[in-house]
Amino acid sequence: VDSFLTNARFFDELRIDGHLLHTAVRYGLSQALLDAAALATGRLKAEVVCDEWQLPCVPEAIPLFGQSGDDRYIAVDKMILKGVDVLPHALINNVEEKLGFKGEKLREYVRWLSNRILSLRTNESYHPTLHIDVYGTIGLIFDMDPVRCAEYIASLEAEAQGLPLYIEGPVDAGNKPDQIRMLTEITQELTRLGSGVKIVADEWCNTYQDIVDFTDAGSCHMVQIKTPDLGGIHNIVDAVLYCNKHGMEAYQGGTCNETEISARTCVHVALAARPMRMLIKPGMGFDEGLNIVFNEMNRTIALLQTKD
């Protein structure tokens, strides 16, 4: 088990009766293989990744992204007081209840969010990034018109009051080629408008090859790398590195429906590959996921610093 990458690739490509192992099996098995390689060689998991990809070991934290679930007000207060780097996800997955038929509810929420940060922060240097997942709902209220979608998204910038704003999944075009085309048109229109709001790809961007295709098309500013969807965790490393190399911001995400083990493993992957941000997980209670990810990251950084 000395070599993680060789073993991970073997099981990621293994076919039984003509079929690859389920992505979840490959995801979990590759985590066990990384842990085994670290234990067998007396290294941290982050060190194993750095060594096998010939990356520098950088003992510096990756910005963490807190997700609120539907508790998008109380959870935000917790995030502000704990100084979370990126917030709040917000789960804007319903037009009538959360977005508004003219986008007015999201506009009001972004205004409340920025006001809340500015009034509750304990240090004026705290300047978090706003990252809101809208699950394709903006496209629904603007009839999938990329210009109208972009105009609305650009108008939210003023409500953010100087805080960086990312909108994830503004549209769901129903298939990958159309999704790339729609996101590209929205991104280009935002540039034409001089907007600083950034677009994050989510829907139809699942596998390593999808991430490459969305990146090569310049379809957005950031892609979510949905860690369980890539199978073996070595694919996460490759995806982050591809984004970093080609000027695409990498968001190492995943799902609230993971385990404490996978969350901690993802910390090591992030510390090695260096995405722009990492999702706090598992769960949507926020506190639990923050404790798991924050503590693992800081333990690992402290151990890396002792080896310098």
What kind of region is each of these model predictions?
Residues 1, 5-6, 27, 238, ...:
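Structured C-terminal cap/extension of enzyme domains
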Residues 1-43:
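Metal- or metallocofactor-binding catalytic centers and their adjacent structured scaffolds
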Residues 17, 21-29, 76, 93-94, ...:
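Catalytic cores of large soluble enzymes that bind and process phosphate-bearing ligands
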Residues 29, 33-41, 45, 49, ...:
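Structural signal for hydrophobic packing residues in well-ordered secondary-structure cores
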Residues 35-109:
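Glycine-rich, mobile lid/loop segments that gate access to catalytic sites or pores
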Residues 84-88, 95-140, 144:
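Charged, long alpha-helical assembly modules
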Residues 119-272, 279-297:
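Catalytic core of soluble alpha/beta enzymes
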